[in-house]
């Protein structure tokens, strides 16, 4: 038995203790009011974790209010472990995106791996089997020839290995994602992990603890000291000395999680439990307080009953450890042994560590001695909200309607196609198992959205993650609108109707008034776009304090759009299909280069107005595309993105490298620089001749510009003055990124 006298007495140096726990004097005054006495160290640690930015959203919550969260197909919106939408045939999709930025910068492999593990637990804790994963990862100047580039290539390799190793061991396919490189991430990379699962509509479980006397059961890996202070660490800034917090990074074991997953799914088939919650950030503290808080209950925990991996652990460590692969269950009274037997069958630790009470109080005991007593509602539901100061940043109003370069269109094309931003990332996604479970239709690198079929039905789900952080830096509100629209458009081009989004809002320091103004603007942009596009927000995550040595990242709202197609045979390809088919531009190319990839690469900096977006026009384009794909008019489609029309056509020609590329002959009659303009609400479609007039009429009905620009065919890529062989394009597109990564090996 570990002596805990030092944890129960009066805190001697309160100022230093508050500093270590990232609590303010005002926080401490509030704690005194709640407890009506000074806290002991255990209680102070619990308050620090639950009131951290990571757990409480104290700086951001006020701006999230007003997100559209309801629709006839929404079963569960924000507030639970994940969002849920009805996809028909008594099935629901459960999904969420979440950040694991700070841990991944400190220990890239472990940080990324546990990020994947944590988001998977959020999904299967609701009764769903995970069936697909995505990721959005962002690094600094990876092309730098010095130590900075070497460092970020190391970080990239570690993150990719961590994502791949965990997902592959879990048997969950990683089917897509996005990757970006900007100097703003030099001191703070981003690793956002997304997971989607499927569950029957009448078999959903929630994170609640109710029913007086119901037992509270700990299941999963034993608790160690890894991850101590993780929630507080994730709510703090980085500096050049941040390597000292390695101990706050959790250590994952995907094999243990696989056993936990299967044991939980077996448990869900029987009527044995009331609720279940993942032990994520803040570990046993957050799971217990959140479960009881949602139900208005109290709870008693006997911490000496918690399975421990290390000797000499104390209540402070047990409550705040973020050891991975652990869950907390509220079982039905009298069903304890059946629950324990299921986990014993799967060789997963399980122990009864407490019970639900009616007190509304969390009471913690250590070998019969009460060591903490805290009102639950004050921590779980009523954390202090901060009204951080805002300072608007002038959105640039001058138009960037041309690229300041003397390069020809051919030279610009070659530069962009081989750039680290555009070049194919098969070195990355080849490390992910994208075909396990045998449901994948379009894996990473094969389509604008990634798609899986829904077993036992004729339907398929699409999912895509997107955010152009340069746009959000220059114009946060409209940049966020573009992120929502683009993520949904990626599903549209493959034939699926977007139904809902999950967002991961990555920002710098909330103490910087300009950062909080950008946060407010981004939230407003998301609200407006989701309302017009009818894609409610059902889950999400906020990650603040993404800055290092005073340098904030660009505002980066990673948006995942999830869509549904009723007939899997109507999925539209993103690559050229048939020689002789016509190519059509839907939408209008405009001279808008502010924040574009071409501007960044060719001019060395970004400035000016970002591409404009008309959400009503965007929605009309979606409806046109859904009609056309449903009537099987489209052979292929791809939206115009980074690099403009020329790069979009190049990707359609080259595909993912597994099939023979097909050339094209295109004459746009556009000024040459406009071939690289990333205009919004624009899609290239491949159409057989017999469907051309019908599609043209439909475009007219929806008031969408329709321009025939050429045809598919040949072994030359010819787009206006760009004329290049497919072999040369393949070399640039498929080898550039791999060469960059290989230089350190």
UniProtKB/Swiss-Prot annotation:
Residues reported to bind Mg(2+) 2: 122, 278
> What are its E.C. numbers?
6.3.5.3
Which positions does UniProt annotate for substrate binding? 99-102, 121, 250, 322-324, 543
Pathway it acts in? Answer: Purine metabolism; IMP biosynthesis via de novo pathway; 5-amino-1-(5-phospho-D-ribosyl)imidazole from N(2)-formyl-N(1)-(5-phospho-D-ribosyl)glycinamide: step 1/2
Q: Which GO terms describe its biological process?
A: 'de novo' IMP biosynthetic process
GO cellular component annotations of the record? cytoplasm
Q: What residues bind Mg(2+) 1, as annotated?
A: 98, 541
Which residues are involved in binding ATP? 57, 96, 503, 540
Q: Which Pfam families match?
A: AIRS (PF00586), AIRS_C (PF02769), FGAR-AT_linker (PF18072)
InterPro entries in the record, alphabetically?
PRibForGlyAmidine_synth_PurL, PurL_linker, PurM-like_C_dom, PurM-like_C_sf, PurM-like_N, PurM-like_N_sf
Give any GO molecular function from the UniProt entry: phosphoribosylformylglycinamidine synthase activity
Active-site feature positions: 54, 100 (proton acceptor)
**What is the annotated localization of this protein?**
Cytoplasm
Q: Which reaction does it catalyse?
A: N(2)-formyl-N(1)-(5-phospho-beta-D-ribosyl)glycinamide + L-glutamine + ATP + H2O = 2-formamido-N(1)-(5-O-phospho-beta-D-ribosyl)acetamidine + L-glutamate + ADP + phosphate + H(+)
Q: Which domain of life is it from?
A: Bacteria
Enzyme class name: ligase
Give UniProt keywords alphabetically. ATP-binding, Cytoplasm, Ligase, Magnesium, Metal-binding, Nucleotide-binding, Purine biosynthesis
- UniProt-listed Gene3D superfamilies: PurM-like C-terminal domain, PurM-like, N-terminal domain
- Main location per the UniProt record: cytoplasm
Fill in the subunit field for this protein.
Answer: Monomer. Part of the FGAM synthase complex composed of 1 PurL, 1 PurQ and 2 PurS subunits.
Q: Which NCBIfam families match?
A: FGAM_synth_II, PRK01213.1
Q: Which family does it belong to?
A: Belongs to the FGAMS family.
Q: State what this protein does.
A: Part of the phosphoribosylformylglycinamidine synthase complex involved in the purines biosynthetic pathway. Catalyzes the ATP-dependent conversion of formylglycinamide ribonucleotide (FGAR) and glutamine to yield formylglycinamidine ribonucleotide (FGAM) and glutamate. The FGAM synthase complex is composed of three subunits. PurQ produces an ammonia molecule by converting glutamine to glutamate. PurL transfers the ammonia molecule to FGAR to form FGAM in an ATP-dependent manner.
* Stated name of the protein: Phosphoribosylformylglycinamidine synthase subunit PurL
Q: What is the lineage of its organism?
A: Bacteria, Pseudomonadati, Campylobacterota, Epsilonproteobacteria, Campylobacterales
């Amino acid at each position: 038995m570990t002596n805990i006298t030092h944890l129960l007495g009066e805190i001697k140096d309160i100022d230093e203790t508050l500093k270590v726990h990232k609590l303010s004097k005002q926080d401490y005054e509030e704690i005194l009011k709640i407890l009506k006495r000074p806290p002991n160290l255990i209680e102070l640690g619990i308050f620090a974790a639950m009131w951290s930015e990571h757990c409480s959203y104290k700086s951001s919550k006020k701006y999230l209010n007003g997100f559209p969260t309801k629709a006839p197909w929404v079963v569960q919106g924000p507030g639970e472990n994940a969002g849920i939408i009805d996809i028909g045939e008594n099935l629901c999709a459960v999904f969420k995106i979440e950040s694991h930025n700070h841990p991944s910068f400190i220990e890239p492999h472990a940080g990324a791996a546990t990020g994947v593990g944590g988001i998977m637990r959020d999904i299967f804790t609701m009764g769903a089997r995970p069936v697909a994963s995505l990721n959005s990862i962002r690094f600094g100047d990876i092309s730098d020839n010095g130590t900075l580039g070497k460092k970020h290539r190391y970080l990239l390799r570690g993150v990719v290995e961590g994502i791949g190793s965990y997902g592959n061991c879990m048997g969950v396919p990683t089917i897509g994602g996005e990757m970006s490189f900007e100097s703003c991430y030099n001191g703070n990379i981003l690793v956002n992990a997304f997971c989607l699962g499927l569950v029957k509509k009448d078999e959903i479980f929630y994170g609640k603890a109710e029913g007086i006397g119901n037992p509270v059961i700990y299941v999963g890996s034993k608790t160690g000291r890894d991850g101590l202070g993780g929630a507080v660490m994730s709510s703090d800034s980085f500096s050049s000395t941040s390597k000292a917090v390695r101990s706050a990074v959790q250590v994952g074991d995907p094999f243990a999680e696989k056993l936990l997953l299967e044991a939980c799914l077996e448990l869900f088939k029987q009527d044995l439990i009331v609720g279940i919650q993942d032990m994520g950030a803040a570990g046993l503290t957050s799971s217990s307080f959140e479960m009881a808080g949602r139900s208005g209950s109290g709870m008693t925990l006997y911490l000496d009953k918690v399975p421990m991996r290390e000797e000499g652990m104390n209540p402070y460590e047990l409550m705040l450890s973020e050891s991975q692969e652990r869950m907390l269950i509220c079982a039905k009274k009298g069903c304890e042994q059946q629950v324990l037997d299921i986990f014993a069958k799967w060789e997963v630790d399980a122990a009864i560590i407490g019970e639900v009470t009616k007190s509304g109080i969390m009471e913690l005991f250590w070998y019969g001695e009460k060591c903490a007593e805290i009102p639950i509602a004050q921590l779980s539901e009523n954390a202090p909200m901060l009204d951080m100061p805002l300072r608007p940043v002038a959105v640039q109003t001058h138009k960037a309607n041309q690229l300041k370069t003397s390069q020809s269109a051919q030279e610009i094309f070659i530069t962009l196609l081989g750039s680290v931003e555009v070049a194919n990332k098969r070195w990355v996604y080849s490390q992910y198992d994208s075909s396990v479970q045998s449901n994948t239709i379009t894996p990473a690198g094969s389509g604008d959205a990634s798609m899986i079929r829904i077993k036992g039905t004729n339907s398929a789900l699409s999912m895509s993650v997107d955010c152009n952080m340069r746009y959000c830096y220059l114009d946060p509100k409209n940049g966020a609108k573009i992120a929502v629209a683009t993520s949904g458009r990626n599903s549209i081009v493959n034939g699926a109707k977007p139904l809902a989004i999950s967002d991961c809002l990555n920002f710098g320091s909330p103490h910087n008034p300009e950062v909080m103004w950008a946060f407010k603007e981004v939230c407003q942009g998301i609200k407006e776009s989701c309302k017009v596009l009818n894609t409610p927000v059902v889950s999400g995550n906020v990650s603040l304090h993404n800055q290092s040595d005073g340098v904030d990242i660009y505002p980066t709202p990673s948006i995942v759009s999830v869509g549904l197609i009723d007939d899997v045979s109507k999925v539209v390809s993103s690559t050229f299909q048939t020689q002789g088919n016509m190519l059509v531009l839907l939408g209008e190319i405009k001279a808008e280069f502010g924040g574009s990839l071409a501007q960044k690469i060719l001019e060395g900096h970004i400035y000016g107005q970002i591409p404009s977006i008309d959400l009503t026009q965007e929605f009309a384009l979606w409806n046109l595309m859904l009609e056309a794909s449903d009537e099987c008019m489209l052979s292929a489609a791809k939206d115009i993105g980074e690099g403009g029309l020329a790069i979009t056509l190049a990707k359609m020609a080259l595909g993912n490298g597994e099939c023979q590329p097909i050339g094209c002959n295109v004459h746009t009659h556009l000024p040459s620089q406009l071939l690289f303009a990333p205009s919004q609400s624009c899609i290239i479609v491949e159409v057989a001749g017999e469907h051309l007039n019908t599609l043209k009429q439909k475009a007219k009905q929806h008031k969408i510009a329709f321009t025939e620009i050429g045809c598919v065919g040949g072994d030359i890529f010819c787009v206006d003055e760009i004329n290049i062989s497919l072999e040369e394009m393949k070399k640039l597109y498929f080898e550039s990124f791999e060469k960059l990564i290989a230089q350190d090996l």
